[in-house]
Amino acid sequence: MPNRRGSRNAYYFFVQEKIPELRRRGLPVARVADAIPYCSADWALLREEEKEKYSEMAREWKAAQGKDAGPWEKQKPVSTPLRRPAMLVPKQNVSPPDMSCLSLKSDQALLGGIFYFLNIFSHGELPPHCEQRFLPCEIGCVKYSLQEGIMADFHSFINPGEIPRGFRFHCQAASDSSHKIPISHFESGHDQATVLQNLYRFIRPNSGKWPPIYCKSDDRARVNWCLKYMAKSSEITQDLELVTVEDLVVGIYQQKFLKEPSKTWVRSLLDVAMWDYSSNTRCKWHEENDILFCALAVCRKIAYCISNSLATLLGIQLTEAHVPLQDYETSNSVTPKMVVLDAGRYQKLRVESSGFSHFSSSNQEQRSNTPTGDYPSGVKISGQSSSVRGRGITRLLESISNSSSNIHKFSTCESSLSPYMSQKDGYKSFSSLS
């Protein structure tokens, strides 16, 4: 009997691709076998055409090993832990976005189309045998168009509810390794029903059917689960159509430019770090605490990347609503050879000068950012001014620029004193000049 221990199928390559993400969450994943229990739910949410990518990888591997892959057949995951039927995550019936409804033959219709980018953060991911897989703690949503850029955004912290017994340390460790949102006694957290209703009010169309909501493919399983979980505690439920933003970008290129980019290229387009410390990207709480992971920042960076990619192709004039242009101007003024950051000192100074904690300042943000119209709590219109600036490298570059101007003034002053300098002694004291 041939040895089949070395056989690799589509699920093997899917798990192998998910390992870096699992490690970022703080999960103890050293090899593929360790990651298998954490990937079964995400695998179940994939469509058949998405699984075909990993099936092709398996066939290529078998061909390289001198094996005959044979006719294509559906690959089944190996070593997938069994769960009760009630605990299975329902398979999401999501089809690729229907780009024909946007009438992409008309440039004006494409530029004026409205898109919503959504992301929900959780206090880690519980094992597959748990009925509650995620604990939602933060939500961010952005209203975007290619013509106007970011038109409005919605952000709110979520009260995750009771932590499942025995998983408090697991959830705390996952939070500390990413968004660092406290798992309990967080004053800025709102109940799940209120947050979901405010989200519905933010994306509710004036007429017609509800628009599709876009998120990254790596986050779709978590976002979809959290939406359904939060809907259980809300009186008003709406079955939102959740589509991957990768499909949106592929659809735009395919319909408008008659070419279809690969999903790998699109993912590399969206997963960039150049916007991580840009101004007005993160929420105020994450900005003040100098924390990189933020649900609102994920949505905003999607808009930045799409604007940056399609601006020249569609003739879009970039504005502050498309990308943070002021950071470009600042970063191009000075190019230091070495950068030393002391974020702790600046953090201490900001706390002492403000006179209140980060939690109370976040509450003030919630109140100050709430418009007086029909917009729900957490909604901010792009036209409103904001005092939040980028931390770290942006402020350092500005200080270096100011220091350069001061050095120039000093050199001018030194030149004016040159007649008083003695060639023999090299200098004279100012007292001797009198």
Swiss-Prot record:
Keywords: Cytoplasm, Developmental protein, Differentiation, DNA-binding, Meiosis, Nucleus, RNA-mediated gene silencing, Spermatogenesis. GO terms for biological process: cell differentiation; male meiotic nuclear division; negative regulation of DNA-templated transcription; piRNA processing; regulation of miRNA-mediated gene silencing; regulatory ncRNA-mediated gene silencing; spermatogenesis. It is found in: Cytoplasm; Nucleus. This is Protein maelstrom homolog. Residues 363-372 have a biased composition (Polar residues). Residues 357-387 are annotated as: Disordered. One of its GO terms (molecular function) is sequence-specific DNA binding. The keyword Cell wall biogenesis/degradation does not apply. It holds the Pfam family Maelstrom.
